[in-house]
Amino acid sequence: MPYREELPYDEGLDNTIPFLNEGYLYITNRRNRFNRDMFKTRLLGGKQVICMAGKEAAEVFYDNEKFKRHGAAPNKVLHTLFGQDGVQTLDGEAHAHRKTMFMNLMTKDSLTEIADLVEEEWKHALTIWEQEEQIELYEEAKKILTKAICRWTGVPTDGVDMDKLSEQLGDMYEAAEKIGMKHFKGELSRKKTEKWLMNMTASIREGKQITGEHTPLYNIATHRDINGDLLDEKVVAVEVLNLLRPTVAISVYIALSALALHDYPEAKEKLVDADAVAYKRFVQETRRYYPFFPVAPAIVKQDFLWDGYDFKEGTLVLLDLYGNNHHPELWNEPNEFIPERFKDWDKSPFDFIPQGGGDYITGHRCAGEWLTISVMQRCINIMVNKMDYIVPEQDLSLSMKKMPSIPKSGFILEHVRRK
């Protein structure tokens, strides 16, 4: 007889409020309480949910025979963060076909190009910052990344209020777990930018030369699905936003990188005139150590038995991304900031999962992870080697229930000067 056991259960008719109140630590707190990496709870109106963590759990979670993504994300997340019918919601051949389109954009040359564009925009911003008494790095980084990613994707911005566009792209990921007016603002920003990009798609398909034929915008607008059909204009807009929005969200990591440089001066000192390997380790440790995505959702595709528990078709399962990155069985001293730990990391796709795990093509690991790393390396290099600044007294605390979590002050810099 196969081994089975009853899972621990987090009592309550609906634990959505505790989940929101505890944020990144909700699953970890209960894993510690139950002394088990898997437990049952009720969320989203009393729906039964399985929460789990660990390397083996991630391997199972990213098994496409056992789990699907369609229908997993709550509607409020689709209405702000992901959009309808984007690559994150697809499964099987349709997902692999769409994901390949994205991965084909992530060539070595294109990753260097986006990093170069970010550095160019950062240098332009430096000229302005030098005239200012202080700047808020998080908001300024959003503006820099908005300009750079629009140039990289080939999105024409003549006559566009770039500060407003930056705000709208930020609204989409900042409002994902919010309620009330903040969430409404995120939905409205998505609707407006989708309409803007749908009009561009129509222009491209009418033969108007609004962008180059080798740009990501053109490639997505003319992409055909597995049936040979052009994507719906709204889906094109969603997928172009799947390049714009996550790139602007790297501003969260830039603020967290600045916090790491401030809090760990010994680690910063090692980056002065260091090689790319040292920067890569610092980037990876920043992504491991600080909170970014809290969980990943999926739905059981068909009944199966794993780790003594019968997973039933249709059950919602949450993988603890933050918890995996701090799991004591996966990381030595998980709550310490140690970039050198990545010197001996085996590059497993299932332990280090700040932006999801598994395979890039067949699985649901974030297609923009390489872009994120490339941009972060370049920005950290600028902050260490190409500019001076003072970090004044301010509230640099991180909220473990606010998603995304950034320093409360937005990370204020004073007396910014280029070196």
Model-assigned labels for residue ranges:
Residues 344-408:
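Cytochrome P450 heme-thiolate "Cys pocket" and heme-binding signature region
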Residues 2-28, 75-202, 419:
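Cytochrome P450 catalytic-domain helical core, especially the substrate-recognition surface
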Residues 237-240, 248-272, 368-387:
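Cytochrome P450 catalytic-core helices
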Residues 17-35, 273-309:
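Conserved cytochrome P450 K-helix E-x-x-R motif and the immediately C-terminal K′/meander segment
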Residues 265-273, 289-308, 387-405:
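Cytochrome P450 fold signature focused on the C-terminal beta-domain
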Residues 190-252:
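Conserved cytochrome P450 catalytic core segment spanning the I/J/K helices
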Residues 1-78:
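N-terminal membrane-proximal hinge/A-helix region immediately C-terminal to the signal-anchor transmembrane segment
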Residues 320-346:
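Conserved cytochrome P450 K-helix/beta-meander segment immediately N-terminal to the heme-binding cysteine loop
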